[in-house]
UniProtKB/Swiss-Prot annotation:
One of its GO terms (biological process) is translation. GO terms for molecular function: RNA binding; structural constituent of ribosome. This is Small ribosomal subunit protein uS9m. Its main location: mitochondrion. Belongs to the universal ribosomal protein uS9 family. Residues 278-297 are annotated as: Disordered. It comes from the Eukaryota.
Length: 297
């Protein structure tokens, strides 16, 4: 059947196949000798045999064993951590209360593949770092410590600045408060409770009772009404905005007299600026949110 289809006998086909396999043999054997038909020429080493026939180049070995992966640098880090984890997998672990600050995604990208790094790969790194960090501190070796130290966030130790407000040579505390487009600059000093706003009495400048109560609210929060003199300069915005800006400034100025009052003033809300603004009008609407009446026909 084979001879009918190909015109070649089975014995002839096997002979040709053997010849093809013999041609496909390597030029040099493992001992460095040349294969030449019935005999072979002997060489002391394979390099000499290759040099005679022009085979002088050698294959370049990649520096990383993960060279052919999608992200070689990240995979190299993961391989090192996995090897370390397998080595100390039987070590007991403890519940870590405070985890160290590891490198952020952007910082790790500098050594972990750059734009090739994915968020899932970064989460994989954090999982392995936290697992190694959970080993009992009494059993942690230098190898583990040195490896984890490579992934700690580098923080520059800066001297802590004194953020407490200080009184000037006249015993005054200066502060600036803002609300919308209004700004208030106040000087607070211990006294009999006198309050001047732009060289005018409080009742003359703020006609509305609500605005006057807003100005006095920081003093009421610490039970100090009538114990401090306030000299304020306000500008910009409307009357209510100026009153809220003045309240913000007085609250900040009172902290300089007694830092322990900061918690109470903060809970009262006078130390936090109110960033709310009037929402702008939108096209096609009557106001910011109000829509015109819909008519079917």
């Amino acid at each position: 059947m084979f001879s009918r289809l190909t015109g070649v006998s089975l014995r002839q086909g096997l002979t040709v196949q053997k010849r093809l396999f013999s041609y496909a043999r390597p030029l040099f054997n493992s001992s460095g000798s040349e294969r030449t038909g019935s005999g072979s020429r002997q060489y002391n080493d394979g390099a000499r045999a290759g040099a005679e026939y022009g085979y002088t180049g050698t294959r370049i070995v990649p520096k990383l064993s993960t060279f052919y992966s999608a992200n070689p640098h990240h995979e190299a880090h993961i391989d090192n951590l996995e090897a370390l984890l397998r080595k100390y997998i039987k070590y007991p672990t403890v519940q870590v209360e405070e985890r160290p600050s590891w490198l952020s995604l952007q910082e790790y990208a500098l050594i972990g593949g750059g734009s090739r790094l994915k968020s899932t790969q970064y989460k994989q790194l954090l999982f392995m770092l936290n697992r190694l960090n959970s080993i009992d501190p009494q059993l942690v070796t230098d190898e583990i410590s040195n490896t984890l130290a490579k992934y700690h966030k580098k923080t520059k130790l800066q001297p802590q600045r004194d953020t407490l407000k200080q009184l000037d040579e006249f015993g005054r505390s200066l502060a600036i408060g803002r609300r919308k487009t209004s700004t208030a600059k106040v000087y607070v000093v211990r006294g009999e409770g006198k309050i001047l706003v732009n060289d005018r009495q409080l009742n003359d400048y703020f006609v509305k009772m609500k605005d006057r109560e807003s100005v006095m609210y920081p003093l009421k929060a610490i039970d100090s009404v009538g114990k401090y003199n306030v000299f304020a300069m306000v500008s910009g915005g409307g009357i209510t905005g100026q009153a809220d800006a003045l309240m913000h400034a007085i609250g900040k100025a009172l902290v300089a007299f007694n830092p322990l009052l900061k918690t109470r003033l903060h809970r009262s809300g006078v130390l936090t600026r109110d960033y709310r603004h009037v929402e702008r009008k939108k096209p096609g609407k009557r106001k910011a949110r109000k829509m015109p009446t819909w008519v079917k026909r």
